[in-house]
Protein backbone atom coordinates (compact mmCIF):
# COMPACT_ATOMS: atom_id res chain seq x y z
CA UNK A 1 0.00 0.00 0.00
CA UNK A 2 1.37 3.39 -1.02
CA UNK A 3 -0.18 5.23 1.93
CA UNK A 4 0.83 4.75 5.55
CA UNK A 5 -2.67 3.93 6.74
CA UNK A 6 -3.49 0.70 8.52
CA UNK A 7 -6.18 -0.60 10.82
CA UNK A 8 -5.41 -2.18 14.16
CA UNK A 9 -7.69 -4.52 16.01
CA UNK A 10 -7.80 -4.59 19.76
CA UNK A 11 -6.74 -7.75 21.54
CA UNK A 12 -9.27 -10.57 21.22
CA UNK A 13 -9.83 -10.43 24.98
CA UNK A 14 -11.63 -7.12 24.32
CA UNK A 15 -14.31 -8.90 22.27
CA UNK A 16 -17.78 -8.44 23.72
CA UNK A 17 -21.20 -9.87 22.89
CA UNK A 18 -23.70 -7.36 21.47
CA UNK A 19 -27.16 -7.66 19.95
CA UNK A 20 -27.01 -7.31 16.15
CA UNK A 21 -29.38 -5.29 13.97
CA UNK A 22 -29.22 -6.17 10.25
CA UNK A 23 -30.00 -3.10 8.13
CA UNK A 24 -31.56 -2.87 4.67
CA UNK A 25 -30.38 -0.23 2.20
CA UNK A 26 -28.63 1.94 4.80
CA UNK A 27 -25.16 2.10 6.30
CA UNK A 28 -24.52 3.87 9.58
CA UNK A 29 -21.04 5.33 10.12
CA UNK A 30 -19.36 6.39 13.38
CA UNK A 31 -20.52 9.85 14.58
CA UNK A 32 -23.66 9.59 12.44
CA UNK A 33 -27.04 10.09 14.13
CA UNK A 34 -29.90 8.56 12.15
CA UNK A 35 -33.49 7.41 12.69
CA UNK A 36 -34.27 3.83 11.70
CA UNK A 37 -37.66 2.17 11.28
CA UNK A 38 -37.61 -1.42 12.49
CA UNK A 39 -40.37 -3.97 11.97
CA UNK A 40 -38.95 -7.50 11.96
CA UNK A 41 -39.51 -9.46 15.18
CA UNK A 42 -35.84 -10.46 15.61
CA UNK A 43 -34.73 -6.88 15.01
CA UNK A 44 -37.22 -5.50 17.53
CA UNK A 45 -36.03 -8.06 20.09
CA UNK A 46 -32.38 -7.07 19.43
CA UNK A 47 -33.30 -3.45 20.19
CA UNK A 48 -35.14 -4.46 23.37
CA UNK A 49 -32.11 -6.43 24.56
CA UNK A 50 -29.86 -3.43 23.84
CA UNK A 51 -32.19 -1.12 25.79
CA UNK A 52 -32.24 -3.50 28.76
CA UNK A 53 -28.44 -3.71 28.82
CA UNK A 54 -26.13 -0.81 27.92
CA UNK A 55 -28.00 0.56 24.86
CA UNK A 56 -25.21 -0.65 22.56
CA UNK A 57 -26.06 -2.52 19.36
CA UNK A 58 -24.04 -3.71 16.37
CA UNK A 59 -25.42 -2.31 13.10
CA UNK A 60 -24.52 -4.28 9.96
CA UNK A 61 -25.81 -4.21 6.40
CA UNK A 62 -27.56 -7.15 4.82
CA UNK A 63 -26.03 -8.38 1.57
CA UNK A 64 -29.50 -8.52 -0.01
CA UNK A 65 -32.08 -6.01 1.19
CA UNK A 66 -35.17 -8.00 0.23
CA UNK A 67 -34.49 -10.90 2.63
CA UNK A 68 -37.00 -10.83 5.48
CA UNK A 69 -35.20 -13.42 7.61
CA UNK A 70 -31.46 -13.01 7.00
CA UNK A 71 -29.09 -15.68 8.25
CA UNK A 72 -25.44 -15.34 9.26
CA UNK A 73 -24.24 -15.77 5.65
CA UNK A 74 -26.55 -12.95 4.48
CA UNK A 75 -25.00 -10.29 6.73
CA UNK A 76 -21.72 -8.41 6.25
CA UNK A 77 -19.02 -8.92 8.91
CA UNK A 78 -18.08 -5.24 9.30
CA UNK A 79 -20.36 -2.57 10.64
CA UNK A 80 -20.74 0.07 13.31
CA UNK A 81 -21.26 -0.30 17.02
CA UNK A 82 -23.95 2.22 17.94
CA UNK A 83 -25.79 3.63 20.93
CA UNK A 84 -29.58 3.69 21.00
CA UNK A 85 -30.48 7.29 21.85
CA UNK A 86 -34.26 7.00 21.65
CA UNK A 87 -36.78 4.26 21.01
CA UNK A 88 -40.42 4.83 20.16
CA UNK A 89 -42.95 2.02 19.73
CA UNK A 90 -45.42 2.90 16.98
CA UNK A 91 -49.12 1.88 16.91
CA UNK A 92 -48.56 -0.55 14.03
CA UNK A 93 -46.09 -2.59 16.12
CA UNK A 94 -42.95 -1.24 14.47
CA UNK A 95 -40.28 0.80 16.21
CA UNK A 96 -38.69 4.11 15.34
CA UNK A 97 -35.24 4.23 16.86
CA UNK A 98 -32.62 6.98 16.90
CA UNK A 99 -29.07 5.63 16.91
CA UNK A 100 -25.61 7.18 16.98
CA UNK A 101 -22.71 5.29 15.49
CA UNK A 102 -19.69 5.13 17.78
CA UNK A 103 -17.05 2.67 16.51
CA UNK A 104 -16.16 0.62 13.46
CA UNK A 105 -16.37 -3.03 14.42
CA UNK A 106 -16.06 -6.55 13.08
CA UNK A 107 -18.21 -9.54 13.93
CA UNK A 108 -16.08 -12.44 15.15
CA UNK A 109 -17.44 -15.90 14.44
CA UNK A 110 -21.09 -16.51 13.73
CA UNK A 111 -24.15 -14.36 14.28
CA UNK A 112 -26.49 -16.50 16.35
CA UNK A 113 -29.76 -16.49 18.25
CA UNK A 114 -33.28 -17.86 17.90
CA UNK A 115 -35.35 -14.87 19.04
CA UNK A 116 -32.80 -12.13 18.23
CA UNK A 117 -29.34 -11.84 16.67
CA UNK A 118 -26.20 -11.42 18.74
CA UNK A 119 -22.50 -11.82 18.04
CA UNK A 120 -19.05 -11.42 19.46
CA UNK A 121 -17.80 -8.01 18.30
CA UNK A 122 -14.28 -6.63 18.03
CA UNK A 123 -13.86 -2.82 17.96
CA UNK A 124 -11.50 -1.62 15.22
CA UNK A 125 -9.19 1.20 16.24
CA UNK A 126 -8.86 4.21 13.97
CA UNK A 127 -5.96 4.12 11.49
CA UNK A 128 -2.53 5.46 12.35
CA UNK A 129 -1.49 8.03 9.74
CA UNK A 130 1.15 10.60 8.90
CA UNK A 131 -0.30 14.08 9.67
CA UNK A 132 1.24 15.79 6.64
CA UNK A 133 0.02 13.08 4.29
CA UNK A 134 -3.46 13.21 5.84
CA UNK A 135 -3.67 16.95 5.32
CA UNK A 136 -2.76 16.61 1.62
CA UNK A 137 -5.16 13.71 1.06
CA UNK A 138 -7.96 15.43 2.99
CA UNK A 139 -7.63 18.54 0.85
CA UNK A 140 -7.75 16.41 -2.30
CA UNK A 141 -10.84 14.53 -1.11
CA UNK A 142 -12.63 17.76 -0.16
CA UNK A 143 -11.84 19.28 -3.59
CA UNK A 144 -13.11 16.16 -5.37
CA UNK A 145 -16.26 16.06 -3.27
CA UNK A 146 -16.84 19.77 -3.98
CA UNK A 147 -16.84 18.96 -7.71
CA UNK A 148 -19.23 16.07 -7.07
CA UNK A 149 -21.62 18.35 -5.14
CA UNK A 150 -21.61 20.86 -7.99
CA UNK A 151 -22.54 18.12 -10.47
CA UNK A 152 -25.06 16.34 -8.24
CA UNK A 153 -28.10 18.52 -7.59
CA UNK A 154 -29.40 16.14 -4.89
CA UNK A 155 -26.78 17.31 -2.37
CA UNK A 156 -27.29 20.72 -0.77
CA UNK A 157 -24.30 23.05 -1.31
CA UNK A 158 -24.34 23.79 2.44
CA UNK A 159 -22.96 20.29 3.00
CA UNK A 160 -19.58 21.59 1.78
CA UNK A 161 -19.52 24.13 4.61
CA UNK A 162 -19.82 21.42 7.24
CA UNK A 163 -17.37 19.10 5.46
CA UNK A 164 -14.73 21.83 5.16
CA UNK A 165 -14.71 22.18 8.95
CA UNK A 166 -13.95 18.51 9.68
CA UNK A 167 -10.36 17.89 10.84
CA UNK A 168 -10.58 14.19 11.70
CA UNK A 169 -9.81 12.10 8.56
CA UNK A 170 -12.01 9.17 9.59
CA UNK A 171 -14.96 11.47 10.27
CA UNK A 172 -14.34 13.27 6.97
CA UNK A 173 -14.42 9.97 5.06
CA UNK A 174 -17.55 8.80 6.89
CA UNK A 175 -19.39 12.09 6.33
CA UNK A 176 -18.59 12.14 2.62
CA UNK A 177 -19.52 8.47 2.23
CA UNK A 178 -22.87 9.13 3.91
CA UNK A 179 -23.68 11.72 1.22
CA UNK A 180 -22.78 9.49 -1.74
Model-identified regions with their sequence ranges:
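N-terminal low-complexity, acidic/polar interaction/targeting segments
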Residues: 2-180
